[in-house]
Amino acid sequence: MVDSKTPAKTKLLDSSSISNVRVVLRVRPFLPREISDESCDGRSCVSVIGGDGGDTSEVAVYLKDPDSCRNESYQLDAFYGREDDNVKHIFDREVSPLIPGIFHGFNATVLAYGATGSGKTFTMQGIDELPGLMPLTMSTILSMCEKTRSRAEISYYEVYMDRCWDLLEVKDNEIAVWDDKDGQVHLKGLSSVPVKSMSEFQEAYLCGVQRRKVAHTGLNDVSSRSHGVLVISVTSQGLVTGKINLIDLAGNEDNRRTGNEGIRLQESAKINQSLFALSNVVYALNNNLPRVPYRETKLTRILQDSLGGTSRALMVACLNPGEYQESLRTVSLAARSRHISNNVSLNPKVETPKVKIDMEAKLQAWLESKGKMKSAHRMMAIRSPLMGTNQTSISQSSVKKLLCHRSAIAESAKLAGTGQRDAFVTARNLFGVETLAASHLWEPIRNLQLASPTKEDERDTSGEENLLVSEASLRDNTLDVEKKYTELSPLREALSPIDSNAKPNSAHGSSPFLKPMTPKTPFLSTNPEIMQMEGTCQKFNAWSNNLKTSLIKEYIHFLNTANREELRELKGIGQKMAEYIIELRETSPLKSLTDLEKIGFTSRQVHNLFKKATEGVLEKPVSASTTP
């Protein structure tokens, strides 16, 4: 079982809590080549007052420029000096308390951030004599898996030139970054390797390390050219899965100092771009901006769960003691990251195999009941109004005649013009009108089991009468459907055609669909305020305003409910703008067109966007009609 003396134990048992990103500072020692340099006096530009690495309270970190005597002060959570074993201290005091939560279904993230040559890769990977945070974390998790009978798996990938690549696959396998319906990031195509011992971990992990992109630069002999991410997933007995992400970020580079050219310059540009996007995310979260630019780069999308998401996060800011400017930029972003709050929540339980077996049994039972339901449906059809008063079986000839009437109804619907034809087609358009298909009226006929004709059926003279009664009931159903469609469509608030050709139908009269009449010009519903206006132009303008208001309501409703593909079908909205709209409405639904200005639209652009959408509706051809 998990040690009950873990300091964070009480917090880990909560189903959800608020946790700020914890930021600690690690200053690496001077390298031998730096000590031998005459320009290096061995003095660090970083100092601390107010605590050490063992203190839980915040510390004040001072940066002093030896050339200009400029001083800067920042508040961080902990400070770890230039001791050779300070990585082990960081693990014991910062990373180790996060591990028990993984076995309870929580996620955690540890990322090393800093300039190139500041010791990030050494902090995460380490060497044989001084292991880094990755092997130390794996060793602790494996020992806890033995005690709790849990399983551990690892995945290892890199973000190189803003593309994700699986490092555990022999062949180059690019990973797709996707979002689910809840906004959680998923990596499609990422492989995982079960790990039961440190030897298995070292075998898989070292294979991935060798495949990671590194190169020699002017500032570092072995410089990482990509962001490396090691994911350790744990599945406990209750099938609750938690994971920890160990991220080794590539360092930002000053190409004036490195002298990068060619491919190295392109790599440096992508690295700096992703780190700049990371700083924009930190800025947006600190200032509570309505839009956080997670989607600017693959790196920020991956870190979306760690910065402002649901993971407990630890940032290890790595510094070179002899570089003031680089240290200043690193500590500045790290200090701002401390104020980011994560809403840490418990991962849902995974279905057990027993539940899956039960689901198969339920599926089998459902299939059996489906057959019974069909039989019951047929029995209901026998008792339907189609059978007349005698409740006898309908003959095949009567059904064939009724089906002929159905084809006649379809022909009359075609003659009724595009306006009536659209009322019988189920489709989703810009304004979200979902109409009811006329085929629903024929479900009793479709499910009816035809009986073979008998002599008794041939002698039955009530078949024609039953058919006429059926037609009358179908007409009543049709009127009910049209009434329901009128209630469903919000556009009827502005436009409500009145059928001036409507006449009372007799019980034995033919269906109105069988004798299509010449369509007449529809009239607008009588609004008392508008009808009191004098002049046709004033009335027309009033109806136009009502129509415009209804279109705006439907347009806003569409923006709040449509998915990414449906939004992209609108004129003027591309893929990135559709993603911005989805992010905006997750915070709060759009209430007016001016809300689009929150994602960068100007008022003129919003007007043009709505104009383009309505042009597509108004450009549709209108069927010509004449009045007597």
From Swiss-Prot:
GO terms for biological process: microtubule-based movement. GO terms for molecular function: ATP binding; ATP hydrolysis activity; microtubule binding; microtubule motor activity. Residues 496-519 are annotated as: Disordered. Residues 20-340 form the Kinesin motor domain. It holds the Pfam family Kinesin. Gene3D superfamilies: AF1531-like domain, Kinesin motor domain. One of its GO terms (cellular component) is microtubule. The keyword Transmembrane helix does not apply. Keywords: ATP-binding, Microtubule, Motor protein, Nucleotide-binding. Residues 498-509 have a biased composition (Polar residues). ATP binds at residues 114-121. Belongs to the TRAFAC class myosin-kinesin ATPase superfamily. Kinesin family. KIN-10 subfamily. This is Kinesin-like protein KIN-10B. It comes from Arabidopsis thaliana (Mouse-ear cress). The lineage of its organism: Eukaryota, Viridiplantae, Streptophyta, Embryophyta, Tracheophyta.
